[in-house]
């Protein structure tokens, strides 16, 4: 029996080396296959690993990075907004103020079609915002309803602005002189009552015959609508002014 410290025979060591070499060759083949994968996938996987790690802010809430818009593509769509006949002349006069926000801010293609009396808007490769077409349509619609261009531009800059439309007959059925008096109470002498409601509630109001359009935030529209409805129902302007003062003081405290 050989001693435990005796040197092993050379043939046995060759067999061991052959087995180890076969294993190494097999590993090299697997490495070549893994190297054939594009580097972009590896980078994407590393990014996923980094993104999977949750980052917490000071209060302990998870903090997520903003979604990148580089990979987002806007569909090529078009929209036509009809223009009423009585708004065509104001549209032509203020066209130089209307199209720059649509072209420069929203990156839309705009055309005024005089034959069909519509404003046509299209998205293109430069358009970034997916809601640009809808914002542009709302802006043009606000102008066609009778709002000033400077007031309608606020729809492009702020997301929480809306337009609410209702008629006098939705509140109370009035005809003839009664309807005229109700509209006169809303406007007031030289528009004094209408301006008071606008300033107190931070809204813009358009009186188009028996239709009333209100532009503003959700809560502001509700306050302005309550004042207009009370005038239609016959409340004296003095009482409405008192309520508006209360509303204005509350809004100053809130904001």
From Swiss-Prot:
Keywords: Cytoplasm, Nucleus, Ribosome biogenesis, RNA-binding. One of its GO terms (cellular component) is cytoplasm. The keyword Cytoplasm applies. It is found in: Cytoplasm; Nucleus, Nucleolus. Its main location: cytoplasm. Disulfide bonds: none annotated. One of its GO terms (molecular function) is rRNA primary transcript binding. InterPro entries: KH-I_PNO1_first (IPR055212), KH_dom (IPR004087), KH_dom_type_1_sf (IPR036612), KH_PNO1_2nd (IPR055211), KRR1-like_KH1 (IPR041174). Residues 1-71 are annotated as: Disordered. SMART domains: KH. One of its GO terms (biological process) is endonucleolytic cleavage to generate mature 5'-end of SSU-rRNA from (SSU-rRNA, 5.8S rRNA, LSU-rRNA). The keyword Chloroplast does not apply. Pfam families: KH_KRR1_1st, KH_PNO1_2nd. Residues 176-228 form the KH domain. Belongs to the PNO1 family. Required for small ribosomal subunit (SSU) synthesis. Has a role in the processing of early nucleolar and late cytoplasmic pre-RNA species. Component of the small ribosomal subunit, ribosomal RNA processing complex (SSU RRP complex). This is Pre-rRNA-processing protein PNO1. The lineage of its organism: Eukaryota, Fungi, Dikarya, Ascomycota, Saccharomycotina.
